[in-house]
Swiss-Prot record:
It is a peripheral membrane protein. [4Fe-4S] cluster binds at residues 64-65, 129, 160. NDH is composed of at least 16 different subunits, 5 of which are encoded in the nucleus. It is found in: Plastid, Chloroplast thylakoid membrane. Binds 1 [4Fe-4S] cluster. Gene3D superfamilies: 3.40.50.12280. This is NAD(P)H-quinone oxidoreductase subunit K, chloroplastic. It comes from Chaetosphaeridium globosum.
Length: 242
């Protein structure tokens, strides 16, 4: 009698069919149940996975860069696939996107929004005007030369304005950064990052030459005051003699 592969397969199939009819409810072993119901991971990896998949941004748009970000909401780019849900309250957001020029009068409100966001929080500086002040950085007396002077920035996105594809790339890089964080590093970053508080009042700074001129004027005024005091004393002494 010659057995080929087909007859062996048919015999094994008949045995499996007989076993299924004999015992229709199979009981799986403990090892199979444990392997199918247990996930081995760390607390850092699990929390990072949950956070990077649900970044809720707060949109702080002040100029034309914000229009490019609004293009992501459409069906062409569909930023919902990255878990981005725009929020109108800073208390519900963990990401703030600054897009546009930031003036000194707007700086306290930006810092207040950043302080009201829960930890951990992230910042994306979008556009040349936000990063360096842009074309307003040379002659303007009321423009902040970079939003990183007010709040710590995690991702810099240059451009005037940057394209929606670049914004998606910045979000992907931020997701990679969030996925590699640990609790120790997060606490270290929070203590390292310092930013202006609400009580701080920004004032325009003067050049070095103007500061030197102001010091000379103050010193000349003090010298004139001392000379005038001496003359007054001399005149009083002369008057008392007569």
């Amino acid at each position: 009698m010659v057995l080929n592969a087909n007859t062996q397969f048919q015999n094994s199939f008949n045995e499996d069919l007989f076993d299924s009819i004999k015992n229709p409810v199979k009981t799986s072993s403990d090892k199979e149940e444990l392997s199918n119901s247990i996930i081995l991971t760390t607390l850092n990896d699990f929390s990072n996975w949950a956070r990077l998949s649900s970044l809720w941004p707060l949109l702080y748009g002040t100029s034309c860069c914000f229009i490019e970000f609004a293009a992501l909401i459409g069906s062409r780019f569909d930023f919902d696939r990255y878990g981005l849900v725009p929020r109108s309250s800073p208390r519900q957001a963990d990401l703030i996107i600054t897009a546009g020029t930031v003036t000194m009068k707007m700086a306290p409100s930006l810092v207040r929004l950043y302080e009201q966001m829960p930890e951990p929080k992230y910042v994306i500086a979008m556009g040349a005007c936000t990063i360096t002040g842009g074309m307003f950085s040379t002659d303007s007396y009321s423009t902040v030369r970079g939003v990183d002077k007010l709040i710590p920035v995690d991702i810099y996105l240059p451009g005037c304005p940057p394209k929606p594809e670049a914004i998606i790339d910045a979000v992907i890089k931020l997701r990679k950064k969030v996925g590699q964080e640990t609790y120790f590093e997060r606490a270290k970053i929070q203590s390292f990052h310092r930013y202006f508080t609400i009580s701080h009042r920004l004032k325009p700074t003067y050049s070095v030459e103007e500061q030197l001129k102001a010091k000379e004027l103050i010193s000349n005024r003090q010298e004139n005051l001392t000379i005038s005091k001496k003359k007054i004393k001399e005149s009083e002494e002369i008057f008392l003699q007569f």
